Amino acid sequence: MLITTEGFILKNRKFGETDSILTIFTRKAGKITAIAKGARRPKSNLLAGIQPFCYSEFVLYKGKNMYTVSQCEAKEIFYPLREDLKRLSYASYLVELVEAVTTEGQTNHRLFNLFGKTLFLLKKSDIEINPIVRAFEIKLMNYLGYKPQLMSCVNCDSKETTAWKFSATEGGLLCSSCYSADLFAMKISNTAVKLAIFLLMKDITEVQKLKISDHLNEELKKILKQYILTHTNKYDFKSLEVAEKL
Ligand SMILES: [Zn+2]
């Protein structure tokens, strides 16, 4: 069976003399593994479209265990990401995160669109990286089915509290009367709650110029990291740490 779909290259590994094994996040088939035969021959017409991050149009043959790339045409190679180590590292973080949280063969159109928009944003020079990355993380959780409850207490629905905490296991805010519902809940400031709501509601292209303090970014980053870890249990955040040191 042949399918035609757009997709992003998440991973590209050498295989044998001239082949490549690809992990592709496709629009129509979700995350898939595909072999690109002869792709590493200098004159291969697959070569351009299968580099990491590449957004390409693929014609894929679905075999028993794996797809085979029969044609591919690069639509966007994200060149600016490749020449700037900082952007490259953040893009690698997003790629790893998507790879870790998606299931082979399961489509997720909202995540696919978000991933594409975010890579296109990271290509631009006049952007604020931190709000973009935080927005990506919180939207990713939403699209995986873990939309955090940020308007009221997740335990008693109260909108009033002396101070909020965020419970990763309960998936939202806890008011001061409900702290005992999760002993590992983390303090969260009112400003961070407002920022999280903003990032969740707005399209990611609308947060590209948003200025947030390092302090606020750190606060939300810690909470989202805990939230992602609790529900995906697969990701170690090493590439994010590398990106932040640059
Ligand atoms: Zn409560």
Curated annotation (Swiss-Prot):
Disulphide-bridged cysteine pairs: none
SUPFAM superfamilies: ArfGap/RecO-like zinc finger, Nucleic acid-binding proteins
Record's keyword terms, sorted: DNA damage, DNA recombination, DNA repair
One annotated Gene Ontology cellular component of this protein: bacterial nucleoid
Pfam families reported for this sequence: RecO_C, RecO_N
Keyword Iron applies: no
Presence of keyword Methyltransferase: no
GO biological process: DNA recombination; double-strand break repair
PANTHER family in UniProt: DNA REPAIR PROTEIN RECO
Job of this protein: Involved in DNA repair and RecF pathway recombination.
UniProt record similarity statement: Belongs to the RecO family.
Protein name as catalogued: DNA repair protein RecO
Annotated source species: Alkaliphilus oremlandii (strain OhILAs)
